[in-house]
Amino acid sequence: MNTDNPKSHISRIAYPAIIVFLILTLLGSLVERFHPFTSWLTPPVALLMGLAYALIFGSTHRRANKLGSKVLLQYSVVGLGFGMNLGESLASGRDGMMFTIISVFGTLLLGWFIGRKILQMNRNTSALISAGTAICGGSAIAAVGPILKAEEHEMSVALGTVFLLNAVALFIFPSIGHWLALDQQQFGTWAAIAIHDTSSVVGAGSAYGEEALRVATTIKLTRALWIVPLTLVFSFVYKTKGAKRFPVPLFILFFIGAIILNTYLLEAYFPEVGRFVASLARKGLTLSLFFIGASLTKEVIASVGVRALLQGLFLWILISVGSLAFILLI
């Protein structure tokens, strides 16, 4: 960070001040009498605040943004498990399994055709965007990148494409859901299938309702487990060796453990504890979206490029419309 730039001096004050303000507002929202003053701070608003900060001040506090957007998000997702019941979650995951299988393989095939045959993109960038769209955004890209031996700029382009579309999805999906009068189950399923990254899926579900949040989170994290077979498929198709590990996101296992603990212990003996932890986790999720927005600088947006954005956009539209039509027809 350039200390001679006046913006850098302002950002050193503004950044922690904004975070403290957000934390106090979110904690205040846990108290019922403060709701009229705190209800405005929703996940989309937090993301928008982060975007505004990034566009004004640029790339500052990268370490804090990375910790907030990844670690805080993962802790928050685990915390959401303390508000879920195992039987209901298994039912949601089972209901969404067919959508998941069709959409994962369909997205990978469409991504290959659009990226390589129509847009004539290089192999790695096209494959990374397809993987990020098919599974769970940045996590899938990070898992597949080493297998493809992708260059740093190829990873950056794919991540930038996915993050930009995620930001858009967080704003427009709840509005479309209300316009189409989707119920909580329908919207949660649609968000989990059509939105790439876990953060935006959970954010959109939270904005739509508690049941939509539960359904979306369960289906999305079930979908995220496809990272393991995805890495195996990519290793076979692209004939690459030397991938040291097939990353199973550890927070997903903790999320499952939280659901089990809540179902068999907290719901029976300490129901208030589970509800409080889940409520606190939703606040943490909202805060993590500020960090994600603050990471989307002008440089990230500029790095994407037209063809990468077109592949991501075409895939996203096809998957969104196709999955929505399927949900409405069944």
Curated annotation (Swiss-Prot):
Highest taxon, organism lineage: Bacteria
Membrane topology: Multi-pass membrane protein
Subcellular location: Cell membrane
Signal peptide positions on this chain: none
Family annotation (InterPro entries): UPF0324_pro
Cited Pfam families: Cons_hypoth698
Protein name: UPF0324 membrane protein PG_2004
Organism: Porphyromonas gingivalis (strain ATCC BAA-308 / W83)
